[in-house]
Curated annotation (Swiss-Prot):
Entry superkingdom: Bacteria
Sequence segments annotated as region (G2): 55-59
Name listed for the protein in its UniProt record: Elongation factor Tu 2
Enzyme Commission number(s) of this protein: 3.6.5.3
Function: GTP hydrolase that promotes the GTP-dependent binding of aminoacyl-tRNA to the A-site of ribosomes during protein biosynthesis.
Keyword check for Protein biosynthesis: yes
Renumbered residue ranges of the record's region G5: 169-171
Gene field: tuf2
Record domain tr-type G: where: 10-201
A Pfam family: GTP_EFTU
UniProt keywords, alphabetically: Cytoplasm, Elongation factor, GTP-binding, Hydrolase, Magnesium, Metal-binding, Nucleotide-binding, Protein biosynthesis
Naturally occurring in which organism (per UniProt): Bartonella bacilliformis (strain ATCC 35685 / KC583 / Herrer 020/F12,63)
Enzyme class per UniProt: hydrolase
Gene Ontology annotations for the cellular component aspect, listed alphabetically: cytosol
C-alpha cells in the first residue's frame, strides 16, 4: 500500500494527556482516535514502544487525529516515570495538554505533579477532562471536584478560573453506552482544545538561531560554520551575532551553502554552512550559536528542573549533593557547572526529579525552556530544562 502523503493544509499542534495513574488518560486517548482519527484500541496505545531521547529511554505512544480546524499529534505515556522523563527531555514537545482527572477520586498526587511539571517545562495551555462522571451521582460532589481542580491549576499559575473543564466518561465513549457523557463529551472536549490551546508559532517565523557544530577555514573565502538551523531564516548579507562562551560579537553572513550548493538563505530545519565575514578560525567555536542580533543572550546562572537517571538506566549509582560539578550539554557542547540544591533537599538520588540552581563556568546562549543533558565524562546521567534565568 502506498504511503499516504502528509497534507500540510491545517495548522499542526502537538498535544498530550497528563494526570494521575488510572484516571483514564489512555482510555480518553483511544476515545479521541475513535471519533477524530484511525481508531486505536486501549491495548494498542498502552503497549507504547520505547524510544531514546537525550540518552534516556522513554516509553511513549504516539497517535494522530484531526478536527475540522487542526491536525494533532498526541502523546500518551504508560507510566508516571515516563511522563516525568518525557516532559523534562522534551522528547515529545507539548503545545498543550489535556489533564485527565477522575471525578470519583478528584485531584491526586500525580495530578499535582503533572501540573507542576507542565508549569516548569512551559506547557502553554491545559484543558481538563473530568472523567468517570457516571461514578458520581451527587451533582454537588462533581462541583466540588471541579473547584478543587481549578484551585490546583491556579496554585501553579495556570488560569484556573478560565480553563475549560469538560465532564464525561471515556469508557462510555468507547462502549457507545451513554452518548451525552460519551461521544458528545469527547466532541465537546476537542472543540475546547481547538479553541483554547493556541496554535504555536512555526519555527521558520521565529528569530533566527543556529547552534554551531563545526568550524572550517576555506582558503581565500574565510571561515565557514556548519549546523542545523533551529529556528527562523538567515539571508545572505544579513548581520548576525555570535553568542555564548566568549564575549558576543557581530558579523555578516556572506554565503549560505547546503549540500555544496549556494543558497540565498537557510531556514529552520536546514543543515547549512554559513560563511562569515572577517571572523578568524580561532575566533569562533562549537557550542556558540549564530543568532539574530539581540534575540538571545549569554547566561551562566539559572534555575532548572531535572530528571536524574537510575542505575539501571545507565546513570549514577550514588546520590549527589550541593556543589556537585557535572557537565551540562547544551545544544552542541558540554560546559561544567556547579549545582546548588534547594533548601531542605539534602541530596538527590538516582531516579529523582529535582529543582536546582546551576552556575556554569562559561556563559551559554540561553533562554527559558532550553533543554540540556547532564553528563559525567561523556555519559548521560540526567536531563533537564531551564525553568528560570538568574543572571
Amino acid at each position: 500500500m502506498a504511503k499516504s502523503k502528509f497534507e500540510r493544509t491545517k495548522p499542526h499542534v502537538n498535544i498530550g494527556t497528563i494526570g494521575h495513574v488510572d484516571h483514564g488518560k489512555t482510555s480518553l486517548t483511544a476515545a479521541i482516535t475513535k471519533y477524530f482519527g484511525e481508531f486505536k484500541a486501549y491495548d494498542q496505545i498502552d503497549a507504547a514502544p520505547e524510544e531514546r531521547a537525550r540518552g534516556i529511554t522513554i516509553s511513549t505512544a504516539h497517535v494522530e487525529y484531526e478536527t475540522d480546524q487542526r491536525h494533532y499529534a498526541h502523546v500518551d505515556c504508560p507510566g508516571h516515570a515516563d511522563y516525568v522523563k518525557n516532559m523534562i527531555t522534551g522528547a515529545a514537545q507539548m503545545d498543550g495538554a489535556i489533564l485527565v482527572v477522575s471525578a470519583a477520586d478528584g485531584p491526586m498526587p500525580q495530578t499535582r505533579e503533572h501540573i507542576l511539571l507542565a508549569r516548569q517545562v512551559g506547557v502553554p495551555a491545559i484543558v481538563v477532562f473530568l472523567n468517570k462522571v457516571d461514578q458520581v451521582d451527587d451533582a454537588e460532589l462533581l462541583e466540588l471536584v471541579e473547584l478543587e481542580v481549578r484551585e490546583l491549576l491556579s496554585k501553579y499559575d495556570f488560569p484556573g478560573d478560565d480553563i475549560p473543564i469538560v465532564k464525561g466518561s471515556a469508557l462510555a465513549a468507547l462502549e457507545d453506552s451513554d452518548k451525552s457523557i460519551g461521544e458528545d463529551a469527547v466532541r465537546l472536549l476537542m472543540s475546547e482544545v481547538d479553541r483554547y490551546i493556541p496554535t504555536p508559532e512555526r519555527p521558520v517565523d521565529q528569530s533566527f538561531l543556529m547552534p554551531i557544530e563545526d568550524v572550517f577555514s576555506i582558503s581565500g573565502r574565510g571561515t565557514v560554520v556548519t549546523g542545523r538551523v533551529e529556528r527562523g531564516v538567515v539571508k545572505v548579507g544579513e548581520e548576525i551575532e555570535i553568542v555564548g562562551i566568549r564575549p558576543t560579537s557581530k558579523t555578516t553572513v556572506t554565503g549560505v551553502e547546503m549540500f555544496r550548493k549556494l543558497l540565498d538563505q537557510g531556514q529552520a530545519g536546514d543543515n547549512i554552512g554559513a560563511l562569515l565575514r572577517g571572523i578568524d578560525r580561532e575566533g569562533i567555536e562549537r557550542g556558540q550559536v549564530l543568532a539574530k542580533p539581540g534575540s538571545v543572550t549569554p547566561h551562566t546562572k539559572f534555575k532548572a528542573e531535572a530528571y536524574i537517571l537510575t542505575k539501571d538506566e545507565g546513570g549514577r549509582h550514588t546520590p549527589f549533593f550541593t556543589n556537585y560539578r557535572p557537565q551540562f550539554y547544551f545544544r552542541t557542547t558540554d560546559v561544567t557547572g556547579i549545582v546548588t540544591l534547594p533548601e531542605g533537599t539534602e541530596m538527590v538520588m538516582p531516579g529523582d526529579n529535582v529543582a536546582m540552581d546551576v552556575s556554569l563556568i562559561v556563559p551559554i546562549a540561553m533562554e527559558e525552556k532550553l533543554r540540556f543533558a547532564i553528563r559525567e565524562g561523556g555519559r548521560t546521567v540526567g536531563a533537564g530544562i531551564v525553568s528560570k534565568i538568574i543572571e
